[in-house]
């Protein structure tokens, strides 16, 4: 039974679908009173013990490797504002990877771009993590040129016609310094398409990169390749799962002979679990699964070119994620049952995101629901594509302004702990009124062990109210309700928290995320098409202590 499982173990796969529904006999405590009106929904909590323990870096994010196509734009990573925003989401992994990663070649003799050189010169004789930002004239020039470079990158992505590019020691330094100064753990994706004549992986360029990073005493984790299931389409090269597994074994041997002998290795960063991809994942895990530390796969809900606002609000589309997770977990549990599973790259829509959707308030429904389902089903880490970069699914735009999903991510980081519990809504509203429950993040100064964090999405076009279970009904609750700001409604690129617009105080200061205390016994009101967090204080839940 679910109630008898140890923390951190995945429940049997047959139980995963019912997790969205009523809990049945496992639910402890006295049921709450009957809902007083049609707009009220009664909650059931399962808090006897955690379903799972996710990583403290559960919510992580990426920088797409295509940023290195023109290394001048790596200089953006010197922005103090961008670093402040990244630091707000620590602890987290920063994955550097993507399709372009398999077309990048490290050239240790390559000179840094003028913009990179200008940045490093401006940082000399200073603490690089505390010093000033990019020289203003350099930053202004790059910002003006970025929209044109963005179109180049998106065109390459849409057409799946990639060309090789080289990157320098300076680019590696810029990436590592950004991660280190932001409190992030860097995961670097190495080119897997460099092949010998007999189609084995050519590790010579990876060796050059390892040698350089070793000389700098960098602490880096590694990946090899991105979505190898699509190598044929991207590069005209077919590699089967067995060969890929052998390539990972070779990479692990390479790491073992270097300063990175204890480094983590993740993979295979495979696409969604469809027919040929499933076949590849199975054979990879059999051949090389032993040498990886976690199994990584990718997920997107919809095609960014044709996605609609209705797609972003459709509970049936949100639910498609469940079967993808189940398929992946089933494969891993059968072949490599002790391996953790990570969502190594994910967002709302593939192809760079959906224009005027993936960077708006509406995208938050997909993002928050994916976080909730991932934690509930046993995914240890979720890496959001991207923090900053080309397309529409970024957390931070081209002017380093945080977008709605950034603020949602920041609230998640501050309020949600790594012990995953269970909540459900009674009645027929489950698919459009989606709820998730964790122990509260006790690093938040206002909260303590035993507190609960409920997060919820209201996909109804009317206000709904949540009623806490009877034994928690009179507890103090802090509300963090997120709504769009301005006249664009669901398509707004700014948000308000409890009625206050969220924006940075200055380039190095994030705003306070101020709660709204509710009167004990109050229902938890949620306006139409909104999402938010509710911290139940002094809940004294034993599983959270």
Curated annotation (Swiss-Prot):
Residues 1-37 form the signal peptide. Keywords: Calcium, Cell adhesion, Disulfide bond, Glycoprotein, Hydrolase, Lysosome, Magnesium, Membrane, Nucleus, Secreted, Signal. Residues 529-545 are annotated as: Required for transferring proheparanase to the Golgi apparatus, secretion and subsequent enzyme activity and for enhancement of PKB/AKT1 phosphorylation. The active site is at 227 (proton donor), 345 (nucleophile). It holds the Pfam family Glyco_hydro_79n. One of its GO terms (molecular function) is heparanase activity. Inhibited by laminarin sulfate and, to a lower extent, by heparin, sulfamin and EDTA. Activated by calcium and magnesium. It is found in: Lysosome membrane; Secreted; Nucleus. It catalyses: endohydrolysis of (1->4)-beta-D-glycosidic bonds of heparan sulfate chains in heparan sulfate proteoglycan. GO terms for biological process: angiogenesis involved in wound healing; cell-matrix adhesion; heparan sulfate proteoglycan catabolic process. GO terms for cellular component: extracellular matrix; extracellular space; lysosomal membrane; nucleus. It is a peripheral membrane protein. Highly expressed in placenta and weakly in the kidney, lung, spleen and uterus. Coiled coil: none annotated. SUPFAM superfamilies: (Trans)glycosidases. Proteolytically processed. The cleavage of the 65 kDa form leads to the generation of a linker peptide, and the 8 kDa and the 50 kDa products. The active form, the 8/50 kDa heterodimer, is resistant to degradation. Complete removal of the linker peptide appears to be a prerequisite to the complete activation of the enzyme. Glycans are attached at residues 164, 219, 461. Residues 290-419 are annotated as: Required for heterodimerization with the heparanase 8 kDa subunit. PANTHER family: HEPARANASE (PTHR46145:SF3). Endoglycosidase that cleaves heparan sulfate proteoglycans (HSPGs) into heparan sulfate side chains and core proteoglycans. Participates in extracellular matrix (ECM) degradation and remodeling. Selectively cleaves the linkage between a glucuronic acid unit and an N-sulfo glucosamine unit carrying either a 3-O-sulfo or a 6-O-sulfo group. Can also cleave the linkage between a glucuronic acid unit and an N-sulfo glucosamine unit carrying a 2-O-sulfo group, but not linkages between a glucuronic acid unit and a 2-O-sulfated iduronic acid moiety. Heterodimer; heterodimer formation between the 8 kDa and the 50 kDa subunits is required for enzyme activity. Interacts with TF; the interaction, inhibited by heparin, enhances the generation of activated factor X and activates coagulation. Interacts with HRG; the interaction is enhanced at acidic pH, partially inhibits binding of HPSE to cell surface receptors and modulates its enzymatic activity. Interacts with SDC1; the interaction enhances the shedding of SDC1. Interacts with HPSE2. This is Heparanase. It comes from Bos taurus. The lineage of its organism: Eukaryota, Metazoa, Chordata, Craniata, Vertebrata. The gene is HPSE.
């Amino acid at each position: 039974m679910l109630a008898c499982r140890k923390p951190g173990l995945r429940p049997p796969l047959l139980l995963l679908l019912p997790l969205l529904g009523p809990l049945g006999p496992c639910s402890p405590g006295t049921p709450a009173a009957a809902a007083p009106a049609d707009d009220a929904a009664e909650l059931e909590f399962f808090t006897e013990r955690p379903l799972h323990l996710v990583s403290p870096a559960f919510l992580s994010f990426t920088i797409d490797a295509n940023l290195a196509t023109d290394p001048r734009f790596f200089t953006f990573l010197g922005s103090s504002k961008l670093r402040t925003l990244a630091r707000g989401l620590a602890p987290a992994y920063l994955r550097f990877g993507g399709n372009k990663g398999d077309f990048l070649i490290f050239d240790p003799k390559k000179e840094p771009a003028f913009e990179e050189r200008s940045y490093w010169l401006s940082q000399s004789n200073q603490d690089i993590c505390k010093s000033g930002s990019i020289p203003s004239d350099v930053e202004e020039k790059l910002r003006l040129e970025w929209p044109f470079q963005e179109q180049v990158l998106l065109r390459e992505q849409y057409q799946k016609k990639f060309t090789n590019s080289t990157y320098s020691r300076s680019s590696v330094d810029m990436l590592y310094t950004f991660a280190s100064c932001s409190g992030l753990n860097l995961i670097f994706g190495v080119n897997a398409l460099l092949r010998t004549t007999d189609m084995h992986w050519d590790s010579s360029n990876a060796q050059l990169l390892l040698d350089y990073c070793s000389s700098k005493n960098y602490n880096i984790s590694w990946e090899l390749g991105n979505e190898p299931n699509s190598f044929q389409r991207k590069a005209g090269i077919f590699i089967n799962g067995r060969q890929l597994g052998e390539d990972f074994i070779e990479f692990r041997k390479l790491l073992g002979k270097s300063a990175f002998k204890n480094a983590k290795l993740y993979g295979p960063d495979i696409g969604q679990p469809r027919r040929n991809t499933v076949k590849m994942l199975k054979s990879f895990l059999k051949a090389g699964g032993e040498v990886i530390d976690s199994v990584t796969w990718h997920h997107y809900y919809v095609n960014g070119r044709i996605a609609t606002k209705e797609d972003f609000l459709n509970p049936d589309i949100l639910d498609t994620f469940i079967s993808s997770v189940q398929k992946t977990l089933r494969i891993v549990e059968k072949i490599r049952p002790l391996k953790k599973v990570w969502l190594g790259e994910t967002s709302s829509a593939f192809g760079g995101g959906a224009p005027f959707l993936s960077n708006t308030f509406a995208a938050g429904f997909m993002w928050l629901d994916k976080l909730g389902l991932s934690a509930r089903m046993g995914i240890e880490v979720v890496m959001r594509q991207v923090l900053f970069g080309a397309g529409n699914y970024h957390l931070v735009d081209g002017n380093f302004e945080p977008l709605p999903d950034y603020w949602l991510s920041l609230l998640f980081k501050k309020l949600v702990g790594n012990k995953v519990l269970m909540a459900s809504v009674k009645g027929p509203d489950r698919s459009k009124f989606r709820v998730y429950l964790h122990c509260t993040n006790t690093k938040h100064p206002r909260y303590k062990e035993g507190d609960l964090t409920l997060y919820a999405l209201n996909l109804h076009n009317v206000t709904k109210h949540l009623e806490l279970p009877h034994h928690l009904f009179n507890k103090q609750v802090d509300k963090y309700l997120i709504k769009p700001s301005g006249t664009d409604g669901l398509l707004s690129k700014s948000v308000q928290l409890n009625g206050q617009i969220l924006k940075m105080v200055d380039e190095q200061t994030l705003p306070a995320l101020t709660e709204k205390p509710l009167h004990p016994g109050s229902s938890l009101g949620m306006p139409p098409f909104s999402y938010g967090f509710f911290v139940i204080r002094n809940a004294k839940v034993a599983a959270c202590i």
